[in-house]
Amino acid sequence: MVKIYAPASIGNVSVGFDVLGAAVSPIDGTLLGDCVSVTAAERFSLHNEGRFVSKLPDDPKQNIVYQCWERFCQEMGKEIPVAMVLEKNMPIGSGLGSSACSVVAGLMAMNEFCGQPLDKVTLLGMMGELEGRVSGSIHFDNVAPCYLGGMQLILEQEGYISQDVPGFSDWLWVMAYPGIKVSTAEARAILPAQYRRQDCITHGRNLAGFIHACHTQQPDLAAKMMKDVIAEPYRTQLLPGFAAARQAAQDIGALACGISGSGPTLFAVCNDQATAQRMAGWLQNHYLQNDEGFVHICRLDTAGARLLG
């Protein structure tokens, strides 16, 4: 039996729309991500369990893990009879890379079970393709950090898809999911087709400055560069309470605050435990909208997807 855990991820990280992503894991050891296990069987089967199992499609063939198995078998040129179990711990439409977690765990579990016939670049390419079936377009800003860990800059050049960006070990990422769903397609549709030149210049400066600050280990500069002029000004209207949360983050002393992916999850970056706890407390009391919501204090997950058994 092979069991894979794939962690949650922050798409865009405010400053890198569609080209930057970061994997995160709670500091208390909670598994914030999906697990997929694979065992030998006479015929294929897929069983779903976990906290958010009720949100999965009724038709098994619409389940992205079924599609992972199907795509992997296609790549291998044969049908591989296995029993798969998806442990769905991630809310769907949350902005935490939920579909990426299932895709990464599903494909990596199949690859490990079969003795790693596919290399990482090939597997990551397939992950992006399958993620595209869910979100409507191939993009790697969730699957790359989820699979490889840490912060990943999506380059798609010279035979590789992404490269690692060094993070800051003392940063704490407070993640708050309010318990409502935002459609990725809707969140993309709300964005303008064209941008003003000044916004393009600001975006380029912020992203270049952030990547430079990460590589030269300047956390204050990196935090100042974490501004989103591409998506956040337009998506705020889809996220009740986000503007108030961003103001609270500033008042509490967070270094930065932004939308995780297309939302509704937000993240706030803090550089000490006391600030992170205050931020988490505020979000717990003011940003969550129902019992499905949660807040976690996280660090960058530098390991990425990994074997649990």
From Swiss-Prot:
Organism of origin: Yersinia pestis bv. Antiqua (strain Nepal516)
Catalysis: reaction(s): L-homoserine + ATP = O-phospho-L-homoserine + ADP + H(+)
Function noted in UniProt: Catalyzes the ATP-dependent phosphorylation of L-homoserine to L-homoserine phosphate.
Entry's EC annotation: 2.7.1.39
Enzyme class: transferase
Cited NCBIfam families: PRK01212.1-4, thrB
Pathway listed: Amino-acid biosynthesis; L-threonine biosynthesis; L-threonine from L-aspartate: step 4/5
PANTHER family: HOMOSERINE KINASE (PTHR20861:SF1), HOMOSERINE/4-DIPHOSPHOCYTIDYL-2-C-METHYL-D-ERYTHRITOL KINASE (PTHR20861)
Keyword Nucleotide-binding belongs to the record: yes
GO cellular component terms attached to this protein's record: cytoplasm
Alphabetical UniProt keywords: Amino-acid biosynthesis, ATP-binding, Cytoplasm, Kinase, Nucleotide-binding, Threonine biosynthesis, Transferase
Binding site residues for ATP: 91-101
Gene3D superfamilies, per the entry: 3.30.230.10, GHMP kinase, C-terminal domain (3.30.70.890)
Pfam families to which the protein is assigned, alphabetical: GHMP_kinases_C, GHMP_kinases_N
Compartments in which it is found: Cytoplasm
GO biological process, one term: threonine biosynthetic process
InterPro entries: GHMP_kinase_C_dom (IPR013750), GHMP_kinase_C_sf (IPR036554), GHMP_kinase_N_dom (IPR006204), GHMP_knse_ATP-bd_CS (IPR006203), Homoserine_kinase (IPR000870), Ribosomal_Su5_D2-typ_SF (IPR020568), Ribsml_uS5_D2-typ_fold_subgr (IPR014721)
UniProt GO molecular function: ATP binding; homoserine kinase activity
Name this protein carries in UniProt: Homoserine kinase
Family according to the record: Belongs to the GHMP kinase family. Homoserine kinase subfamily.
